[in-house]
């Protein structure tokens, strides 16, 4: 609630310092470009491993969730046949989520990559990423074990239970996790680009129209000073 108030209060302050009133068409143009670039391709992360991992995890999660919703709610009767494309989407989405999420978790997290913290250090804010990876991983294992038709064994039921628990943690731990991060970041990107377009710039000074004088600064080397 504190962050929400701060977000909207900043937006109100920015309106007061705007130098230009954007038309509806201009707003739509800015928002469309933001969705196509900053959100759909996570361009703010630049070209690199972190961006690839985020794109894999993001689109994997979208495919996984959409496939789950369609198969659960649209093909519910015993006589209905689920088109083969939906299980494919579900499995591809789960695999992308596991690959992108694991890449981020083990190698790209700031506290691991730049601060030398161990990968197994977990705080409340990590619940979302961990539960997201594990729910997809357990779902894939459960699906594989079902395909083996293991008569008289309960291996698949064990991973079904783990799959359910991971999803309960994922959605039940929203209060402590970074789940809201998925929605805050796009909203912040749209506000930032609108602020640049109307001249308010979030009350920051404009960029100087002059050549760089101080070199690369913090971009000179990777942040690994521990």
Name each model feature, range by range:
Residues 7-34, 199:
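Membrane-interface amphipathic/juxtamembrane segments adjacent to transmembrane helices
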Residues 130, 134, 138-161, 165-226:
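Intrinsically disordered cytosolic tails
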Residues 24-40, 85-92, 179-187:
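Hydrophobic alpha-helical segments of integral membrane proteins
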Residues 58-66, 92-102, 124-143, 161-169:
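Hydrophobic membrane-spanning alpha-helices of multi-pass integral membrane proteins
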Residues 63-83, 108, 138-151:
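Juxtamembrane "helix exit" motif at the C-terminal ends of alpha-helical transmembrane segments
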Residues 12-13, 106-119, 175-187:
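Juxtamembrane/interfacial segments flanking transmembrane helices
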């Amino acid at each position: 609630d504190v962050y929400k108030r701060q977000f909207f209060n900043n937006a109100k302050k920015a309106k007061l310092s705007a130098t230009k009133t954007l038309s509806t068409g201009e707003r739509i143009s800015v928002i469309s470009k933001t969705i196509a670039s900053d959100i759909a391709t996570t361009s703010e992360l630049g070209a690199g491993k972190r961006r690839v991992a985020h794109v894999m995890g993001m689109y994997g999660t979208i495919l996984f969730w959409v496939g789950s919703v369609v198969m659960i709610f649209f093909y519910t009767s015993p006589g209905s046949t689920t088109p083969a494309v939906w299980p494919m989407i579900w499995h591809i989405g789960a695999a992308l989520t596991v690959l992108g999420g694991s890449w981020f978790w083990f190698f790209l997290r700031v506290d691991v990559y730049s601060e030398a913290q161990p990968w197994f250090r977990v705080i409340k804010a990590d619940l979302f990423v961990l539960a997201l990876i594990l729910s997809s991983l357990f779902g894939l294992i459960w699906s594989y074990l079902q395909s083996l038709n293991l008569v008289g064994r309960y291996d698949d039921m064990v991973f079904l239970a783990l799959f359910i628990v991971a999803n309960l943690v994922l959605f039940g731990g929203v209060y402590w996790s970074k789940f809201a991060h998925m929605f805050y970041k796009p909203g912040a990107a749209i506000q930032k680009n609108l602020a640049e377009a109307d001249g308010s710039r979030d009350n920051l000074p404009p960029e100087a129209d002059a050549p760089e004088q101080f070199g690369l600064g913090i971009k000179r080397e990777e942040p690994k000073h521990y």
